[in-house]
């Protein structure tokens, strides 16, 4: 079943990771996908692709307007562009704090505010933002990342309140640890114990796949979720449900 037949979907962060998985899945489900990222990947399924730094509001607006001219008005937006960061509140410097907040939170806002007006004018649409379990439950030594992703959750709910009367649904996904280029540095060296700890905290005993997050994004983007808005959906293998003691049944 093509759940996004005749829909136009804009996916940010579409060059890799969760964004790329969303672009592939949405294309498979019948959407014309417009990709947006810092670089154009060598291979992608998108009907059109543009480059922009989501921190640059003018560049975002120009890129989105160009994509709309090429593929048509946007029915679905997936804000998947993002970066990770480690550091406590007293050790992270101003530049890194700004980088993480500007990409993860301000970048989400930059794209959403351009796209949502067209959705309102056309009578509806669906926005899916990428937050994180760390936007719900603060993680150790991730002060900027936690703040940014928590902001994405509340930006999502704020937009759901404001645009619900216009039939624009706004939801977010809160993934756990997902096997992407962003988490690849955790697979080697002194950060590997962090990856192993996260894996063990997932009740399903493994890290997630980008395709699993894309499947959840598809649900929220499609009419299958036609009565869902303002929701933060965990795709976390049970991470937020609770903790288990080692060696117990």
Q: Can you annotate each of these PLM segments?
A:
Residues 137, 218, 229-249:
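Short C-terminal tail/terminal secondary-structure segment
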């Amino acid at each position: 079943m093509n759940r996004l037949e005749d829909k136009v979907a804009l996916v940010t962060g579409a060059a890799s990771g969760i964004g790329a998985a969303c672009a592939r899945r949405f294309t498979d489900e019948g959407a014309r996908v417009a990709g947006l990222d810092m670089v154009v990947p060598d291979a992608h399924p998108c009907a059109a692709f543009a480059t922009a730094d989501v921190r640059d509001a003018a560049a975002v607006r120009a890129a989105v307007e160009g994509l709309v001219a090429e593929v048509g008005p946007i029915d679905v937006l997936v804000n998947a562009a993002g970066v990770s960061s480690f550091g406590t509140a007293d050790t992270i410097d101003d530049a890194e704090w700004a980088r993480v907040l500007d990409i993860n939170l301000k970048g989400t806002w930059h794209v959403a505010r351009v796209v949502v007006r067209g959705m309102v004018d056309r009578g509806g649409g669906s926005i899916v933002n990428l937050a994180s379990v760390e936007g719900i439950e603060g993680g150790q030594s991730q002060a900027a990342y936690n703040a940014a992703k928590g902001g994405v959750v509340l930006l999502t709910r704020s937009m759901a309140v404001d645009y619900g009367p216009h039939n624009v649904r706004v939801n977010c996904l809160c993934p756990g640890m997902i096997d992407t280029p962003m988490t690849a540095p955790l697979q080697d060296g002194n950060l590997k114990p962090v990856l192993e700890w996260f894996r063990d905290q997932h009740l399903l005993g493994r890290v997630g796949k980008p395709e699993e997050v894309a499947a959840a994004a598809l649900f929220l983007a499609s009419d299958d979720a036609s009565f869902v808005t303002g929701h933060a959906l965990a795709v976390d293998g049970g991470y937020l449900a609770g903790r288990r003691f080692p060696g117990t049944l």
